[in-house]
């Protein structure tokens, strides 16, 4: 009987720990985009993108919103990125670069995932706050304007992953 109680306690502790571990995660909008290239190569591609298309850089007037989304302690395998879109609707995407070599020892792939969208207020919109049409519009815009250019710069195959 004691083993049964110990098993219940252990299961409860595991459930509590997994809930606490998920507290600082935001989820993601759509699937992550996997580039079959190294993190260094994708970082260089991002630098080229911002150099050739400076309009995607976060404007100073939008920098005040950064602190309301980037509260979580930095992870050794993610890096925060922001992409600004001036055209209608004006939006700022909070995206993370996920370094798979740190997590899986696979240095030949790196992922980008949209975590949240801001439309000019202190409130960031997470996936749970979007209807299907809005989510699809965000994903299409990111794919058409950002991913397509990064694919060319990295010369790599790009796949979608959940």
Residue ranges and their predicted role:
Residues 19-22:
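C-terminal motif of bacterial Sec signal peptides marking the signal peptidase cleavage site
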Residues 1-11:
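Bacterial N-terminal signal peptides that target proteins for export
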């Amino acid at each position: 009987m004691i083993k049964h109680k110990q098993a219940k306690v252990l299961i409860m502790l595991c459930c509590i720990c997994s809930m606490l571990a998920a507290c600082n995660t935001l989820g993601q909008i759509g699937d992550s985009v996997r580039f079959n290239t190294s993190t260094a190569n994708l970082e260089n591609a991002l630098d080229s993108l911002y150099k050739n298309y400076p309009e995607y850089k976060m404007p100073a007037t939008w920098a005040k919103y950064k602190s309301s989304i980037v509260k979580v302690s930095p992870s050794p395998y993610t890096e925060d990125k922001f992409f600004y879109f001036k055209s209608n609707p004006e939006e700022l995407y909070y995206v993370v670069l996920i370094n798979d070599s740190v997590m899986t020892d696979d240095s030949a792939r790196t992922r980008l995932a949209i975590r949240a969208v801001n439309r000019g207020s202190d409130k960031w919109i997470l996936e749970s706050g979007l209807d299907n049409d809005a989510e699809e519009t965000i994903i299409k815009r990111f794919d058409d304007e950002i991913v397509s250019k990064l694919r060319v710069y990295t010369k790599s195959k790009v796949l979608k992953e959940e």
